[in-house]
Amino acid sequence: MAKSLVLSSLLLALLLAAPLASLADNNVLLTGDVLHTDNQLSFESAAFVMQGDCNLVLYNEAGGFQSNTHGRGVGCTLTLNNLGQLEIHSANSNTPVWVSPRNINTVQGNYAAVLGPDQHVTIYGPAIWSTPAPNRHERRATVSDIPRVRNVLFSSQVMSDNAQLATRDYSLVMRDDCNLALTKGGQTNIVWESGTSGRGQHCFMRLGHTGLIEISDDRLNSVWRSNTVGQEGDYVLILQINGQAVVYGPAVWSTASSASAAL
């Protein structure tokens, strides 16, 4: 079955060459966002597709996943609810066609589903830290509207020497003057900053396994912290299309752990 999945993945890439190219880094679905029929999340060679037959399928090289909902709805869409669950909805019904398992420890909040480098979709949340919210009229967009981005930092990863996350005209930059800055439309238009310019040399920013963001200098002295600590686990920092940087976690569900629905 794994071989057939790889072949299916290659066929999908050939059939949808243009969408895959234009949506190559559409790797995030947030609570309240909508993945419409025949749209997908994608990262490198992996694609998480809300198919026209109402089946949600992850095409990858690591065993894949499917919701097993073929033919159970029409015009199906995928959303992420405020308990960290994916929901498939049919246009002809008010009842969800399929809902992903709920972690017993989850609480209401904002979650994020991320198709990551491991070629699996993992749900993180709830949000435990964020930069200030921007203008509300920029808040939502369907996944098909999101451009190519470099928008995600995972637990244990670091940024330094002007490295950045980016989406649309927003950037979150770990500047070489030791300041972490969120900018819009250019490096001089600062939306938010850590206020740590000049407080260290060769500084770097790291996302820890409790969701803590910390800026340290080259002597490992702490320069700034987000002061939001969750339980031990895997977290993700996402620079969202509305220009807000948000930490979600810990991970509450993944296609990698859902063997019962694997292809």
Swiss-Prot record:
PROSITE patterns: BULB_LECTIN (PS50927). Residues 26-136, 150-260 form the Bulb-type lectin domain. This is Mannose-specific lectin 2. GO terms for molecular function: D-mannose binding. Residues 1-24 form the signal peptide. SMART domains: B_lectin. Disulfide bonds join 54-76, 178-203. Keywords: Disulfide bond, Hemagglutinin, Lectin, Mannose-binding, Repeat, Signal. The keyword Signal applies. Mannose-specific lectin. Has weak agglutinating activity towards trypsin-treated erythrocytes from rabbit but not from human. GO terms for biological process: response to other organism. Heterotetramer of 2 domain 1 and 2 domain 2 chains arranged as a dimer of domain 1/domain 2 heterodimers. Coiled coil: none annotated. It comes from Crocus vernus (Dutch crocus).
